[in-house]
Amino acid sequence: MREVIFMFDCCSCNQDMNVPAEDSGPRPSVINIEKATLQNSNFRMAIWTGEHLQLTLMRIPAGGEIGLEMHPQLDQFLRIESGTGLVKMGCSRELLSFQSSVSDGCAILVPAGTWHNLINTGSRPIKLYSLYAPPQHPHGTVHKTKAQADAAEAQQDH
């Protein structure tokens, strides 16, 4: 017996959507993620925070970096929309044995407990979006700069 599956696009993504002004989670949402990512001017901005998942936008300036970090209890997915960089990962902060050049269209998958950093090696900002499961940052987080992000994380003991 043959099984036929029909798939329908029940929602259309408004191509004119701008960067969300605030975190819309946990309400149901549809956004143009590529456009929102490219328009983002903040170092980090949480645009949707649910109970088990969080979506953030990031802008890493030329010569900048996310900063070496490790999330013991969550997996992370990053998607580069523009820019070029070098991602480093490993089992300890001293042993980052995995390295790869990344650019537009690359997806970076970071397992829980893995030390990682993304360094901008290009002349323009890296624009990316990141999914955390479970959420990593407080609902509504906006850090205009890496310095603000570092200060907030120091207060939260990340």
Task: Name each region found by the language model.
Residues 2-54, 67, 100, 104, ...:
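A short, N-terminal "cap"/entry segment at the start of jelly-roll beta-barrel domains
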Residues 35-38, 94, 119-158:
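Double-stranded beta-helix
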Residues 57, 87-89, 128:
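Short hydrophobic/aromatic-rich beta-strand segments that constitute the beta-sheet cores
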Residues 57-72:
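Conserved short histidine dyad/triad with adjacent acidic residue
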Residues 68, 87-88, 110, 116-122:
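Short beta-strand His + acidic residue motifs that chelate non-heme Fe in jelly-roll/DSBH
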Residues 73-91:
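Glycine- and acidic-residue-biased ligand/ion/polar-headgroup-sensing regions
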Residues 92-111:
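Short acidic-glycine-tyrosine-enriched beta hairpin
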